[in-house]
Amino acid sequence: RDLGLVFNTNGTLDINAGWLKNIRYAASVNYTNRHSYFQDEATNADWGYSQSMTDGAVLSNVPGRPVYLEDGTEVTRVPVGEESLKAWMLPGSYIYMYDVYGKELNTFAKLTTNFAGKTGPIHHRLILGADFRNSGNLGKGKVFDPENPPYRNLSYDFASQRNRAFKDIPFMNHLGVYAEENIQWLMGKHELNISAGIRWDKVCGFGDGFSPRINASVDIIPRHLTLRGAYGITLKAPTLLYMYPDKAYFDLVNFNNASTSAPDGQKFQVITTRVFDAENKNLEMAKNKKCELGLDLKFNKMRFFITAYQEKCDNGYTIAKSLNTFKSVPFVQYSEITPRPSDESQIANLKEIATNPYLLSYTTPMNALKYLVRGIDFDFDFGRVDAIRTAFNLNGSYMWRKSGSNNYMFWNKITGTDYSKYPHMGVFSPDYETDYSERLATNLRVIHNIPQIGLVVTLTANVIWKDRSWKSYGNDSIPIKYISRLDGKLYDFNPDDIDSEEFIGIDRRSTVNPTRLIREGVMPPLLTMNLNIT
C-alpha cells in the first residue's frame, strides 16, 4: 500500500535589468506512506537467537534467569534494561513474517539566477544557482515478531538481525551550489560554442566535492563540419543505506541441551551476543569521469554524427567485507554438570569445556567498485532519395567495458566442527578477477513511400555483430596476506608456507577450476528484421 501527498511550486521573476534577466525558483514536498508485508517458511532454521541489542550480553532462554558455573561464577550477563529478554534455539522449521512501515519525507528547493549579455562578438549566458534536498523516513521500518525472526543470512556464521526503525536514521541534507557559463563566439562564418560549469555538493555529516564540466563545439567547415568535445566529473552521494547501515549482530550458542534427554524444565540455552558497527567512516562520494569527442557532418540532406567516449570510475559504491570487518572473538563452550538436580524445575550448573578464538565477519559500505567503459556511437542519416521515394538511416554503437574491484578477496575453507582447528582468513589480491564485456550492434532503417495508395513501408534490420563477456584472473590461488583467527590482525603471507598445516585452509589451488581460463567462442551475428506497413 502506498499513499502519497505531493506539493510542487515554481515560478519566474522577470527583471531584465542589464545582464540580469530573471530569477527562477522551484520547491516541492513529497510525503509517501508505505506498507509492505512478507511471509515465508524458514527451514533448517535451528539456530540460536537472542533478543539482546547489547554487545557482550549473555542471556538464557528464560528471561532474568541466571546460569552459573560449578564454582558459583555467573555465566549470564544481562544488561540493564534487558531483564525481560531471552535467548533460545529456534525450531528447525517455522513460519515467519514481517511488515515494513515507511513514512518517506522528501523536500527540495532550487533557486536559479540567469544572466545574459554580449561583449564584442561574444554572446554570454551565465547561470548561478543553488539547490537543497532533505530526505528521510519517519516510519517504524522492518517490524517482526522476535519470537519468529526472519530467516538469517547463511553466508555469515552466527549472523542475526534485530528490528530497526527508519525514524532512528538521521535525515540526509544535501546542498548544491553551481555556476555555468555559455559562450557563443561568431568568428566570421565560424561559430564556437563553449559551455563550462562547476558544481559544489555538500552532504551534511558526510563530505563535499567539486564537479567541473566543459562542452565545446567549433565549426571546422561552416554549416558542414563541426567538431565536438566534452569532459566532466560527476559526484554521486551515497544513499542512507550506505551512510547509516544496520549494525552487525551475531548470536553465539555457548550451551544447548535441547536435543538431550533432559526434562523439559531442565532444557536451556546460553547465547552470547556480539554487536559491531558496520558504518564506514572513510566512505566518500563516488566520482565518475567522462570525456567525449565527436564529429558532425552535414551535406545537402545527409547528416552524419559520430561520437567516441570514455567513462571511468575508481571508487563506486558497493557493500562487501573489508580488512576491518573481521573480528576475532572468544567463543566459549560449556557442558552441564551431572547428575542434574533432582528438582526438575532447577537447571544444572555448567563447566567450561573449550574457549577458542573465532573469526566473525560482516559487510560494510565501501568505495571499491571500479569500471572503465569505452565506445563509439554513430547515426548516419542519408536523407531521402526522391527518385525512389526512399529514406535510409543507419545507426549503431560499439561498447567495451572492464570492471572489477579495488577490494581484496577473502576466502577460507572450513572442514569439520572442531573450532580449535578453524582456519585463518586468506586475503587475495584485488586483481584476482576482472570482468570484460564487448558489444557491437547496428540498426538499418529504410522508409519507402507509395503516395498513389497512401502507404508507408518501413523495413528495420538490426544486427548484433558481437556480444560477448569474459573474465581474466590474477593471483586467485595463493593469498598475499591473511587475517589471523587468533587475534584478528592482518599479516603478510609467505608463499613458501602454503603447504604447511596451519595454512591449508586458505590454499585455493585445488579449488579453482582451470577451465576458467578458457574463453567462450564468439557467437555468430544475430539478424532481426521487422517490416511495417502503414
Regions found by a protein language model. Give the residues of each.
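Hydrophobic, lipid-facing positions within transmembrane beta-strands of outer-membrane proteins
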Residues: 3-11, 105-111, 173-179, 196-198, ...
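Surface-exposed loop/turn segments flanking beta-strands in extracellular/periplasmic regions
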Residues: 45-89, 139-163, 248-275, 324-356, ...
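Short loop/turn motifs that connect adjacent beta-strands in outer-membrane beta-barrel proteins
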Residues: 14-25, 116-125, 185-192, 220-226, ...
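Surface-exposed extracellular loop regions of Gram-negative outer-membrane beta-barrel proteins
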Residues: 1-10, 37-43, 55, 78-85, ...
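Transmembrane beta-strands of outer-membrane beta-barrel pores
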Residues: 15, 29-35, 132-138, 173-175, ...
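Gram-negative outer-membrane beta-barrel transporters
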Residues: 187-189, 312, 329-473
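Outer-membrane beta-barrel signature, preferentially recognizing the C-terminal barrel domain
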Residues: 2-6, 166-170, 234-314, 333-345, ...
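Outer-membrane beta-barrel transmembrane domain signature of Gram-negative proteins
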Residues: 52-192, 243-246, 410, 422-432, ...
